[in-house]
C-alpha cells in the first residue's frame, strides 16, 4: 500500500502519460460537474466511489488501471476521479491528507473512506458495498 502526501505542482509533464480515467470512470473537472454526477447517482440509486488522486503520485498511477477495471466490472456504482491539483480548493474541503483517497458516498453522504493504493482493500470495500445494496427494481 502506498500514498503520497501533498506536494506542489511541478513542471515535469512526463508523469501525465498514465491513463487515470477510462472505462466507466467520470473525470470531475469542476465543482458543478461533481454536483451533477452526485445528483445523477442519487436519482439512479447508485453509490459513488470517488478517487481523489494526483498525476504526480506514484501509488495513484499504480492503482489507476485497477480503479478503471473496477468501474467496468461494477456498473451499478458510479466511479468519479478528482485531480487534487486541478480542484485544490474542492479537494481541501474534503480534507485530503494523502493521495489516493477514496470516498464512498450514498445520497451524497460519506459511507466509507480508504486512504492509499491498497488494491485488495479497495476491492473488499467495493464488494462489501455491492453486497449491502439490495437489487433496485427496473425503472419503467
From Swiss-Prot:
The active site is at residues 57, 60. A lipid is attached at residue 4 (S-palmitoyl cysteine). The record marks 58-59 as: Contributes to redox potential value. GO terms for molecular function: oxidoreductase activity. Signal peptide: none annotated. It is found in: Cell membrane. Residues 25-129 form the Thioredoxin domain. Belongs to the thioredoxin family. Plant H-type subfamily. This is Thioredoxin H9.
Amino acid at each position: 500500500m502506498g500514498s503520497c502526501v501533498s506536494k506542489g505542482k511541478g513542471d515535469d509533464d512526463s508523469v501525465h502519460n498514465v491513463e487515470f480515467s477510462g472505462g466507466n470512470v467520470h473525470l470531475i473537472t469542476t465543482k458543478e460537474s461533481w454536483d451533477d454526477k452526485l445528483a445523477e447517482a442519487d436519482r439512479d440509486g447508485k453509490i459513488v466511489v470517488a478517487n481523489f488522486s494526483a498525476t504526480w503520485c506514484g501509488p495513484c498511477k499504480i492503482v489507476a488501471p485497477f480503479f478503471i477495471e473496477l468501474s467496468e466490472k461494477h456498473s451499478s456504482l458510479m466511479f468519479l476521479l478528482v485531480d487534487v491539483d486541478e480542484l485544490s480548493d474542492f479537494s481541501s474541503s474534503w480534507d485530503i491528507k494523502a493521495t489516493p483517497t477514496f470516498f464512498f458516498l450514498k445520497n451524497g453522504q460519506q459511507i466509507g473512506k480508504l486512504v492509499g493504493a491498497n488494491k485488495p482493500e479497495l476491492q473488499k470495500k467495493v464488494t462489501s458495498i455491492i453486497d449491502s445494496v439490495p437489487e433496485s427494481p427496473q425503472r419503467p
